[in-house]
């Protein structure tokens, strides 16, 4: 590290950031350079990045804009930085995260070390049993609408290194490059897909929502995961007041509550029997609603519980169709299990953690796909629907541990 550089950035920091980016993989940016291509001249590329960052001459390239279809229509815009820029952002993130994360509210769960979406679902489930009413709200295009002035004000109150402030501002204003090659300047927002974007979103929402809620409505518990949040209230009147106040607060900070995706929900169950039009909400891929449950004494009752959402099931079924098993008839059943079990296991570990009975639809969908595969692979089963079903049943009896979901079919309700 040269003492003549304006900014003291250790070469080791760049090296460790590169290792982290490599581990996370990720797509190429506008230069179409992959990690493998970057590594062809690794020492030179890392030195060039360190030299520019430590001299203050690093300017982020435009961010590649990719539109991802949403489950209920429309698209979500993602910004994909180049490999080199992801390394630069990771250098900064590794420095600011230990400073910023400790100030965040305990009810903030998104993109934080040691915290997860499953923890957010667990705490929300518990609070739905304690509070009768929930305010579910959606922030319209939150990542795209963050006010740069307010965000940088928050950053400067915690981060003092000039070079970090310099590069954060440059990243915020780096243009998007559309699929058509047009470069679009940005005056608001932080690209969803950037390395530093999640922690910047958390900082912005800490002051916009978390701290504001803590000061103004300490009696109302909430759970926030990035730009997705729910608030628990003791009465319908309180929920109405809180929802109106949140909408006003978001507007003050340059954000907008989505009127069609925000509502008040009644947590209906066997003990809470009021009539109300909204008795379900979806949070982090789980739908919370009245569901049948079994007590320790084997009594059936209605509880307000989270289970995999219809949209999440739809995406998983689409993924199974994307496997195109009917084109893999040259492969043995055990090979299919080895190939797809990691995916099925990942789905179960998350969505099957709460009310696993709701995942039976996916299990049956996978099995139907395997039956079609068998009828296509074996001539003796061709065109015989029942024969395919019987064949798969025999396979389950012979090797009940072969596919991950076969081991879990017997999981109890609730």
Features from the language model and the residues they span:
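Non-catalytic, polymerase-adjacent accessory regions of viral genome-replication enzymes
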Residues: 1-43, 47
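Core structural elements
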Residues: 9, 60-66, 71, 172, ...
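Conserved polymerase palm-domain catalytic core
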Residues: 52-67, 71, 103-268, 280
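Duplex nucleic acid-engaging cores and interfaces of nucleic-acid transaction enzymes
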Residues: 84-88
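A conserved non-catalytic segment of reverse transcriptases
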Residues: 173, 253-328
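A glycine-rich phosphate-binding loop feature that marks nucleotide/adenosyl-phosphate handling sites
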Residues: 225, 262-270, 340-343, 361-367, ...
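Non-catalytic, peripheral interaction segments enriched in hydrophobic/basic residues
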Residues: 336-381
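Extended C-terminal regions of large enzymes
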Residues: 365-369, 374, 378-414
